[in-house]
Amino acid sequence: MTPIFLQRSLVEELKALFVDFYSTDDISKTPPKVNVYQQDLPIALGSEEDETVPYIIVRIDSGNIPELNEQERVEVILVFCIKANNENRQGYLDVMNMIQRVKERFFKNFSVGKYFYFEPPFEWAVQDEDTFPYFYGAVKMNFYCPGIMLEDPLL
């Protein structure tokens, strides 16, 4: 199973995980649809930019296979974005809630899809730059994919 299958599994998992997510900025109390994208945002045409927010990007960052017949470790970065228009600038709370939701999910159950599993560390950060009304955060996680087994009869 390739890192791309891992990425697809994570996209589906995160869509399900955030189906009932509420923003602290939303006075209507209707959950906004959290968009989940593979690797990057789609190209925005015209005024479509705000339609992507809130979003999560599932980005494959790097990977390695330390030795023959071993599992592949894939580093994945999740990027979170929320738009919060309120004057108290509390959009970071939504970002932190999203990070917490992901953390709880993967520390309670390491597996995702049929073939992949998370292994700590779990690293997170929030943006310190002022990008009001947009608030950002990120998570770095390691996942393991099944290894490729050597089939050479000469070895």
Regions of interest found by a model, annotated:
Residues 1-16, 61-71, 112-155:
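Short, charged interaction patches at domain edges and termini
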Residues 80-85, 101-106, 145:
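Glycine-rich loops and low-complexity Gly/Arg-rich segments
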Residues 81-95:
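Short histidine-centered catalytic/ligand-binding loop motif
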Residues 1-68, 154-155:
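Small/polar-rich, solvent-exposed N-terminal microdomains that initiate assembly or binding
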Residues 54-56, 76, 137-143:
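A short hydrophobic beta-strand element
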Residues 73-75, 93-97, 153-155:
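Short intrinsically disordered coil segments
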Residues 92-113:
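Short, hydrophobic/π-rich interface segment
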Residues 58-85:
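Active-site-adjacent structural patch at catalytic or cofactor/ligand-binding sites
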